């Protein structure tokens, strides 16, 4: 592996700005890493080498005249739900192939910032799953990278790119980030990052978000992605703050909520141990810990499915009726199930969601950040569909993996996955959820913990082996 690809986004940006390396050299290093690892992890639907090389050459000319910022000349991967003009959007499914006529705002913002789009990454079909079966985990190719943004997390963890885009409807940025040891931010507050130009799973719950290797890099990418888009009816017309400003202020003065209920129920002992150790370390750093009861927690999963199932089925209604054989069985079953949800049940789920959001907002009057496990269990082996607990209880992986992450989607709060340890059979990551429109505090909290640890610096041993 090239030492260049091991750098963070912030580090390679400084080298590009100082013209110590060229955008073409950075791209070549990333493409070499892709060729070295792709047979192992299968992260990409397509690698846009010719386009990327042309963009890198143009970028080098631009940098000589005007540096556009930390993404200028940096290779980025895009989840194959995002449109790119002239490139098919397949959503990793034979049922869906669209050629976009123009770049949506979120891709255009990356390009305007000088980013070089290297390729499009695999997703679980239509983002409707949590394992991304076509991709593998760079830390153990025998295990799932998680989903649905599994290709994006895998290629970032494998040091093929410095950043990638994802989407998150029930955990699809944070689940693969947890399994691959990357930093993943579920779209900040709903509407903070524009959503037009992406294949939808559930309009009410979909959140875009960045995947990187450090909190600082996440802040840099968010700065570019955030902003108002008139093409997106959910987009927030609110000023975008400077996410880098005050990022290194530490945890002193921040109130960290530690949940007494739900988030530590039925959790792998090693997961709980790692997250509790992270909480203890935060206390040593000066954080104020506040025990909280998460309100209406038992409604998180029913509300998520009560909204997601019918919305996904509505989006796919025509394609499912015309070509059901083109869908994989697991996705087709969920889409057929969504047709059985009544309008009454759907509206009730939306009503309960509103009540939950109000109750959680009251909880956040006492705290600034909530810390809890991202996942209750480690990454499963490829092909596994259930997890068996020590008492013999069997839990479907799709339920286990979204049990905690769905909280962020139902409430609409910004939520960050942050690496917090390893174990003999998988990764352990903690998540932090912040208040609406307060991504800055969430990132500040994450960076303080990251600086006190080295989990984010550990690259996969297998990468580059052949």
From Swiss-Prot:
It catalyses: a monocarboxylic acid amide + H2O = a monocarboxylate + NH4(+). SUPFAM superfamilies: Amidase signature (AS) enzymes. Its EC number is 3.5.1.4. Residues 128-152 are annotated as: Disordered. Coiled coil: none annotated. It comes from the Bacteria. The active site is at 79 (charge relay system), 148 (charge relay system), 172 (acyl-ester intermediate). One of its GO terms (molecular function) is amidase activity. InterPro entries: Amidase, Amidase_CS, Amidase_dom, AS_sf. It is an enzyme of class 3 (hydrolase). Keywords: Hydrolase. Belongs to the amidase family. This is Amidase.
């Amino acid at each position: 592996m090239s030492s260049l690809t091991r750098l963070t986004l912030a580090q390679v940006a400084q080298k590009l700005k100082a013209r110590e390396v060229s955008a073409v050299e950075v791209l070549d290093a990333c493409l070499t890493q892709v060729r070295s690892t792709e047979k192992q992890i299968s992260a990409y639907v397509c690698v846009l080498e010719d386009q990327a090389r042309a963009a890198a050459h143009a970028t080098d000319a631009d940098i000589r005249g005007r540096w556009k910022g930390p993404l200028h000349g940096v290779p980025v991967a895009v989840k194959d739900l995002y449109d790119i003009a002239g490139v098919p959007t397949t959503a990793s499914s034979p049922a869906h192939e669209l050629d976009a006529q123009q770049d949506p705002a979120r891709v255009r913002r990356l390009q305007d910032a000088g980013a070089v789009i290297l390729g499009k990454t695999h997703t679980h079909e239509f983002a409707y799953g949590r394992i991304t079966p076509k991709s593998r985990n760079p830390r153990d190719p025998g295990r799932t990278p998680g989903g649905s943004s599994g290709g994006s997390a895998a290629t970032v963890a494998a040091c093929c790119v410095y950043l990638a885009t994802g989407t998150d409807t029930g955990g699809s940025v944070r689940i693969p980030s947890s399994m691959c040891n990357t930093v993943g931010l579920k779209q900040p507050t709903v509407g903070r990052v524009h959503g037009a130009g992406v294949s939808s799973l559930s309009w009410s719950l979909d959140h875009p978000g960045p995947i990187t290797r450090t909190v600082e890099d996440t802040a840099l990418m968010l700065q570019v992605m955030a902003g108002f888009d008139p093409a997106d009816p959910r987009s927030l017309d609110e000023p975008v703050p400077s996410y880098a400003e005050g990022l290194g202020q530490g945890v002193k003065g921040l109130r960290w909520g530690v949940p007494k209920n739900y988030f530590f129920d039925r959790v792998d002992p090693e997961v709980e141990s790692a997250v509790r150790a992270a909480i203890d370390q935060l206390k040593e750093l000066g954080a104020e810990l506040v025990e909280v009861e998460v309100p209406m927690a038992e409604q998180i999963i029913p509300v998520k499915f009560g909204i997601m199932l019918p919305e996904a089925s509505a989006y796919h209604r025509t394609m499912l009726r015309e070509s059901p054989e083109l869908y994989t069985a697991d996705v087709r079953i969920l889409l057929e199930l969504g047709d059985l949800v009544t309008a009454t049940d759907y509206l009730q789920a939306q009503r309960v969601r509103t009540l939950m959001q109000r109750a959680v907002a009251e909880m956040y009057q006492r705290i600034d950040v909530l810390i809890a496990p991202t996942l209750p269990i480690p990454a499963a082996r490829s092909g596994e569909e259930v997890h068996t607990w020590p008492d013999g209880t069997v839990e479907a992986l799709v339920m286990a993996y979204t049990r905690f992450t769905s909280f962020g989607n139902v409430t609409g709060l910004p939520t960050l996955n942050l690496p917090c340890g390893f174990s003999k059979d998988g990764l352990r990551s903690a998540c932090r959820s912040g208040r609406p429109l307060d991504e800055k505090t969430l990132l500040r909290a994450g960076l303080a913990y990251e600086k006190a640890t080295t989990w984010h610096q550990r690259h996969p041993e297998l990468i580059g082996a052949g």
